Amino acid sequence: MVADVLLTHFNQLFCLNDPGHPLTGQEMKKATIVEDGYIAIKDGLIVALGSGEPDAELVGPQTIMRSYKGKIATPGIIDCHTHLVYGGSREHEFAKKLAGVSYLDILAQGGGILSTVRATRSASFDNLYQKSKRLLDYMLLHGVTTVEAKSGYGLDWETEKRQLDVVAALEKDHPIDLVSTFMAAHAIPEEYKGNPKAYLDVIIKDMLPVVKEENLAEFCDIFCEKNVFTADESRYLLSKAKEMGFKLRIHADEIASIGGVDVAAELSAVSAEHLMMITDDGIAKLIGAGVIGNLLPATTFSLMEDTYAPARKMIDAGMAITLSTDSNPGSCPTANMQFVMQLGCFMLRLTPLEVLNAVTINAAYSVNRQERVGSLTVGKEADIAIFDAPNIDYPFYFFATNLIHQVYKKGQLTVDRGRIL
């Protein structure tokens, strides 16, 4: 078979492993590493991997050949938890954060999520589209090739749908692949204050059926937290969403442990998000149910909290984890997955290989894209992040700098030395 594109002489290829399930325990520490590696691409798919000089049959007169001595290649990075589409920004809350006002106190004052809801409701489709596109461009420049994107800053049908429509449009227009999550249960709207059950009934009866019918989202999510939605309320919504055919995610145990992990385990959610306050019993329940823990260390960093999710304990117990940005305008205003990966080492005490597995193959399972992406494997899409680094330790050791040299998306050179092509 003659390749369309042949990428050769990488210091190392991090092909990683895909055993047919998310990696856990000791599996997180391992990878298939190819020295002096090459990748052959045809029709956007990986058709061959190897070491040294490529087989002659891969090379034809039209084959594009590029050499990458001194560089490493990994699967494209996957950010599997973002709040991508929103109006406005919240830097006006920064001084309060520095003064020690808590996230929930800011929310109770009408700020936080509710502030962004007001800005998003007043934003046009084009405004939201352009703002979200800029974020995606930034992510792509940092090696991200697949992104999960939630609604949740409308809290009414008109705005929630506008957010989902923006995600759908960007999925068509932008190189990054987007996976849509419906999260109208992100907060209790001011018009339903004191009556969250009535709002959940509106979501269940009026919103979810349309989202499903129009195929606007694959997942459903809810914020199970003190002063937001209780475990019983979360169970009520997610069980109905599951009956309609949605895959489930849940924000749980971020600020307080109030039963969200139990809901995730009972309903076999694909992932439980945040988990800074998870207990040993909660870890055991998620392991037993096969729920992936999606950890968001940049949120802890941004909130200036001391308690990070117990990633080391989770992995050692045999739990599958991912890492994501939680990109949003309030509790985590960043879109930099490289920074998140570095926090995975510095603050969660994970090894570079554990982090790399978390943000590639495990993240692919978290967004139900494991058949297509997440590892450099023959037959999968050629989503490739190329780092200007001699080995996998370097991008973690040399932190706070974008070390992406190039990005390939479905076999197309998409980013070249800081420019989107």
Swiss-Prot record:
Task: Quote the EC number.
Answer: 3.5.2.7
Matching entries from CDD domains are given as: Imidazolone-5PH
Give residues annotated as binding Fe(3+).
H81, H83, H251, D326
A molecular-function term among this protein's GO annotations: zinc ion binding
Q: Where does 4-imidazolone-5-propanoate bind?
A: R90, Y153, H186, E254, S331
One GO CC term of this entry?
A: cytoplasm
User: What is the top-level taxon of the source organism?
Assistant: Bacteria
Q: Which cofactor does it need?
A: Zn(2+); Fe(3+)
Q: Which reaction does it catalyse?
A: 4-imidazolone-5-propanoate + H2O = N-formimidoyl-L-glutamate
PANTHER family given in the database record? IMIDAZOLONEPROPIONASE (PTHR42752), IMIDAZOLONEPROPIONASE-RELATED (PTHR42752:SF1)
Please identify the protein, giving its name as recorded: Imidazolonepropionase
State the species of origin: Streptococcus pyogenes serotype M2 (strain MGAS10270)
Q: What is the lineage of its organism?
A: Bacteria, Bacillati, Bacillota, Bacilli, Lactobacillales
Q: Which gene encodes it?
A: hutI
